[in-house]
Amino acid sequence: MRRAKIVCTMGPAVESPEKVRALIDAGMNMARLNLSHGGYDEHQERLDLVRKIALEHGHPVAILVDLQGPKIRLGRFADGPHDLAKDDIFTITTDEIEGTKDRVGTTYKGLPGDCKPGDLILIDDGKVTVQVVEVSQTDVRTRVTEPGTVSNNKGINLPGIAVSVPALSEKDRADLRWGLKAGADFIALSFVRSADDIKDVHQIMDEEGIRIPVIAKIEKPQAVQNIESIVAAFDGIMVARGDLGVELPIEDVPLVQKRCVELAREAAKPVIVATQMLESMISNSRPTRAEATDCANAVLDGADALMLSGETSVGEFPVEAVAMMARIIEKTEGDGLQRIRPLLHNPRTKGGAITKAAAEVGEILGAKYLVAFTQSGDSARRMARLRSAIPILAFTPEVGTYHRMALTWGVESMLAPMVNHTDEMVKQVDSLLVESGRAAIGEFVVIVAGAPPGIPGSTNAMRVHRVGDAIAGVAPAYR
């Protein structure tokens, strides 16, 4: 069983039912809808198609709606792309103009107020770099230090500059409301800078009467500085290495990735490693050796999931990319689960203590499975963060939790009806394991649950169960 999960970005390359079915067969666990591109109708079609085919498979696939965020961009040019040479003077203005080689507008009207002489501005993911030489009320005059081509709507990064853009743009607010109504399982918030950025998201969720987990995308230096409070405030994180590698010195990214994974694991929150995982497979049927090693290292860091972007959304080999990533993960885990660093901190909650004890008992007894009964998914996440070699089954009566646990490392989620007693829970486990052939009569499983059932966050019990005892009615409670 593969433990680390795979996130696939949906797009034109995987529009057909056959392609979506092939993605799920190859190993997709979560589908990402990137709201930087496309309209609501096409995203709704993709969401509905994934849901339909996942239901046919009996296989949960989570849906992530990824908000564009307040991306700062150049405006449009009147006569196409322009090549900028070293030491050219290039002005970025808040005026509404059709751009020329010397002067172009920007989507961010606060740019002159945030910049000062000496600051660097990176254009198109750092392909072009300019240095601020003069600032006026409307214009930022710069000198080109890294030459290259500029064209319509290219992104701007301001490394080391504390920009004053809001956490949510007007587009993001509308997109968030759409995602909640459409049935998303997770929301991803782009360009997070502090823990406070979640407040506006929660306000809109409360207005809509829908609360779902929010993933913070770590792609700004301020987010790295505030990473501990961000992990505490959000429901998970994504190490978005594209913008992160532009805003930070690129040599800092590997250790930032490891630190993010470590903190998320300690907090029992999912962490996704993203960007350029198998980038060359956009146009090639096989990845580079470096990409394969990158995927393996993310697995060994302990990431919950690895994400494919252009590889699946617009690539020539989307299904092959998923299958390749699945093979890399499986091979790495097959020989290297023990290489994932164990958590050194002691749990500070009742649920954390019980799940840790369950994993330790399971290892001593050679248990076939660790089993969590959970309404919110919290017990399953706390068990998963231990990265035990024992497979985890998570039973839940909540459809949303059933889908969301598809993102959690090592967890196979099961939809089960609510019962009124823990003995009924054990019967559910027995029936599933025996009827599916997952475990043999007489093998052991370790179960964690809340007693009485039905109270979220009430995990307070651990039971060692011998498979077959419940369906055989060996005790009066099972009859």
State what each model feature region is.
Residues 1-479:
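Non-catalytic helical/linker scaffolds that mediate oligomerization, partner binding
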